[in-house]
Curated annotation (Swiss-Prot):
It is found in: Cytoplasm. It comes from Clostridium botulinum (strain Alaska E43 / Type E3). S-adenosyl-L-methionine binds at L76, G108, F127, S128, K129, M130, T131, F132. Keywords: Cytoplasm, Methyltransferase, rRNA processing, S-adenosyl-L-methionine, Transferase. The keyword Transport does not apply. Its EC number is 2.1.1.177. Homodimer. SUPFAM superfamilies: alpha/beta knot. This is Ribosomal RNA large subunit methyltransferase H.
Length: 159
């Protein structure tokens, strides 16, 4: 299984980098992990709705250019489906069974994802109705993917 995480914005905090490194190391026995960081566009404090749409489209184009044709794209979006850790485990297993062994999770920037990215998505997932910093969310996503593999393999971790 190949898993790519495309994320808008660079990690700045060392403690988050350490957490990502730890989960990347743990995941290496289950999948080939590739993390793609894309430069976010600066959003002025007084940005209009039109300005925000332009920024989302620019970030969206960067995301779309990073997606390969053979990838099964999973967007992380507030309008996505909320599922449990067990359901995520089954979902990842089922993707592999159906021949979708190149999963691509997409984390948008502070303004969210463009319509073009949402249209390219094969599945939309929502972790919570709450808003999280995208840097922290990257750690949360990696932890849930790791948990999903542990559940799938019947290994102790999930409680």
């Amino acid at each position: 299984m190949n898993i790519t995480i495309i994320s808008v914005g660079k990690l700045k905090e060392k403690y988050l980098k350490h957490a990502i490194d730890e989960y990347s190391k743990r995941l290496s026995r289950y999948c080939k992990l590739n993390i793609v960081e894309l430069q976010d566009e600066q959003t002025p404090d007084n940005a209009s709705e039109k300005d925000e749409l332009i920024i989302k489209d620019k970030e969206g184009n960067k995301i779309l250019n990073s997606i390969k044709d053979n990838m099964y794209v999973i967007t992380l979006d507030l309008k996505g489906k909320m599922i449990s850790s067990e359901e995520l485990s089954k979902f990842i297993d089922n993707c592999g069974v159906r021949g979708n062994s190149n999963l691509c999770f997409i984390i948008g920037g502070s303004l969210g994802l463009s319509e073009a990215v949402l249209k390219r998505s094969n599945y939309s997932l929502c972790f919570s109705k709450m808003t999280f910093p995208h840097q922290l969310f990257r750690v949360m996503l990696l932890e849930q993917i790791y948990r999903a593999f542990r559940i799938s393999n019947g290994e102790p971790y999930h409680k």
